[in-house]
Amino acid sequence: MNMNGNYYPAKPSTEDKRILLVEDDPNFGTVLKDYLVMSGFDVTLAKNGMEGFELFKKEIFDMCILDVMMPYKDGFTLAREIREKNEKIPIIFLTARTMREDVIKGYKSGGDDYLNKPFDSEILLMKIRSMLQRKNI
Protein backbone atom coordinates (compact mmCIF):
# COMPACT_ATOMS: atom_id res chain seq x y z
CA MET A 1 0.00 0.00 0.00
CA ASN A 2 1.33 3.46 -0.81
CA MET A 3 0.87 6.66 1.21
CA ASN A 4 -2.46 7.34 -0.52
CA GLY A 5 -3.89 4.00 0.57
CA ASN A 6 -3.67 2.41 -2.89
CA TYR A 7 -2.59 -1.19 -3.20
CA TYR A 8 0.03 -2.22 -5.69
CA PRO A 9 0.62 -5.79 -6.77
CA ALA A 10 3.77 -7.28 -5.34
CA LYS A 11 6.75 -7.21 -7.64
CA PRO A 12 7.52 -10.67 -8.91
CA SER A 13 10.17 -12.29 -6.75
CA THR A 14 13.21 -13.86 -8.32
CA GLU A 15 13.88 -16.06 -5.30
CA ASP A 16 11.95 -19.03 -6.64
CA LYS A 17 13.08 -18.63 -10.26
CA ARG A 18 15.32 -21.44 -11.44
CA ILE A 19 17.93 -20.84 -14.10
CA LEU A 20 19.84 -23.51 -15.99
CA LEU A 21 23.27 -22.07 -16.80
CA VAL A 22 25.27 -24.11 -19.31
CA GLU A 23 28.88 -22.94 -19.55
CA ASP A 24 32.00 -25.00 -20.19
CA ASP A 25 34.49 -22.49 -18.72
CA PRO A 26 34.53 -23.48 -15.03
CA ASN A 27 35.84 -20.13 -13.78
CA PHE A 28 33.39 -18.01 -15.76
CA GLY A 29 30.52 -20.39 -15.01
CA THR A 30 31.16 -20.24 -11.27
CA VAL A 31 31.49 -16.44 -11.22
CA LEU A 32 28.27 -15.98 -13.22
CA LYS A 33 26.41 -18.53 -11.10
CA ASP A 34 27.51 -16.79 -7.89
CA TYR A 35 26.44 -13.40 -9.29
CA LEU A 36 23.00 -14.71 -10.23
CA VAL A 37 22.57 -16.45 -6.86
CA MET A 38 23.51 -13.19 -5.09
CA SER A 39 20.85 -11.52 -7.26
CA GLY A 40 18.20 -13.88 -5.90
CA PHE A 41 18.04 -16.73 -8.42
CA ASP A 42 18.33 -20.47 -7.91
CA VAL A 43 20.99 -21.46 -10.45
CA THR A 44 22.10 -24.89 -11.63
CA LEU A 45 25.40 -24.95 -13.53
CA ALA A 46 26.08 -27.57 -16.21
CA LYS A 47 29.56 -27.87 -17.72
CA ASN A 48 28.55 -28.86 -21.27
CA GLY A 49 25.57 -29.24 -23.57
CA MET A 50 25.00 -32.93 -22.89
CA GLU A 51 24.94 -32.42 -19.12
CA GLY A 52 22.71 -29.38 -19.60
CA PHE A 53 20.12 -31.32 -21.58
CA GLU A 54 20.08 -34.17 -19.06
CA LEU A 55 19.44 -31.67 -16.25
CA PHE A 56 16.75 -29.93 -18.34
CA LYS A 57 14.90 -33.22 -18.83
CA LYS A 58 15.02 -34.09 -15.11
CA GLU A 59 14.31 -30.75 -13.46
CA ILE A 60 12.04 -27.74 -13.95
CA PHE A 61 13.65 -24.44 -14.91
CA ASP A 62 12.23 -20.98 -15.60
CA MET A 63 15.02 -19.90 -17.95
CA CYS A 64 18.14 -21.18 -19.70
CA ILE A 65 21.39 -19.29 -20.26
CA LEU A 66 23.60 -21.08 -22.77
CA ASP A 67 27.14 -20.73 -24.01
CA VAL A 68 27.51 -21.58 -27.69
CA MET A 69 30.96 -23.15 -28.01
CA MET A 70 30.95 -26.22 -25.76
CA PRO A 71 32.25 -29.77 -25.99
CA TYR A 72 29.94 -32.70 -26.78
CA LYS A 73 26.96 -30.50 -27.72
CA ASP A 74 27.03 -26.85 -28.77
CA GLY A 75 24.56 -24.28 -27.50
CA PHE A 76 22.62 -24.04 -30.76
CA THR A 77 21.92 -27.78 -30.75
CA LEU A 78 21.03 -27.66 -27.07
CA ALA A 79 18.59 -24.79 -27.67
CA ARG A 80 16.82 -26.76 -30.42
CA GLU A 81 16.50 -29.78 -28.13
CA ILE A 82 15.18 -27.60 -25.30
CA ARG A 83 12.64 -26.04 -27.69
CA GLU A 84 11.38 -29.51 -28.63
CA LYS A 85 10.55 -30.10 -24.95
CA ASN A 86 9.41 -26.58 -24.03
CA GLU A 87 8.43 -23.94 -26.59
CA LYS A 88 8.01 -21.11 -24.09
CA ILE A 89 11.03 -21.20 -21.76
CA PRO A 90 13.23 -18.11 -22.25
CA ILE A 91 16.69 -18.87 -23.66
CA ILE A 92 19.58 -16.41 -23.63
CA PHE A 93 22.81 -17.12 -25.46
CA LEU A 94 25.89 -15.74 -23.74
CA THR A 95 28.87 -16.23 -26.02
CA ALA A 96 32.08 -14.91 -27.53
CA ARG A 97 30.77 -15.68 -31.03
CA THR A 98 29.94 -12.27 -32.43
CA MET A 99 29.56 -12.92 -36.16
CA ARG A 100 26.25 -11.87 -37.68
CA GLU A 101 25.68 -15.43 -38.92
CA ASP A 102 26.09 -16.80 -35.39
CA VAL A 103 23.61 -14.31 -33.95
CA ILE A 104 21.06 -15.23 -36.62
CA LYS A 105 21.70 -18.94 -36.03
CA GLY A 106 21.14 -18.37 -32.32
CA TYR A 107 17.72 -16.84 -32.87
CA LYS A 108 16.78 -19.48 -35.45
CA SER A 109 17.72 -22.27 -33.05
CA GLY A 110 15.28 -20.94 -30.45
CA GLY A 111 17.10 -18.20 -28.58
CA ASP A 112 15.19 -15.22 -27.23
CA ASP A 113 18.28 -13.06 -26.78
CA TYR A 114 21.96 -13.15 -27.69
CA LEU A 115 24.62 -11.40 -25.61
CA ASN A 116 28.27 -11.18 -26.53
CA LYS A 117 31.09 -11.75 -24.05
CA PRO A 118 32.31 -9.61 -22.47
CA PHE A 119 28.96 -8.22 -21.35
CA ASP A 120 27.58 -5.85 -18.74
CA SER A 121 26.29 -7.97 -15.84
CA GLU A 122 23.65 -5.40 -14.92
CA ILE A 123 22.24 -5.49 -18.45
CA LEU A 124 22.14 -9.29 -18.30
CA LEU A 125 20.29 -9.09 -14.99
CA MET A 126 17.72 -6.65 -16.43
CA LYS A 127 17.16 -8.90 -19.46
CA ILE A 128 16.66 -11.94 -17.21
CA ARG A 129 14.16 -10.15 -14.98
CA SER A 130 12.29 -8.70 -17.95
CA MET A 131 11.96 -12.08 -19.66
CA LEU A 132 10.85 -13.83 -16.49
CA GLN A 133 8.29 -11.15 -15.76
CA ARG A 134 6.78 -11.51 -19.25
CA LYS A 135 6.79 -15.28 -18.92
CA ASN A 136 4.64 -15.01 -15.79
CA ILE A 137 2.05 -12.59 -17.19
Predicted features by range, described:
Residues D67, T95:
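Active-site residues of response regulator receiver
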Residues L45-M63:
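Acidic, metal-coordinating helix/loop segments flanking the phosphotransfer/catalytic sites
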Residues F119-I128, L132:
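C-terminal output helix
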Residues E23:
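Conserved acidic carboxylate
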Residues P71, M99, K117:
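The feature encodes the CheY-like receiver
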Residues P26-T44:
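Two-component/phosphorelay signaling modules centered on CheY-like receiver
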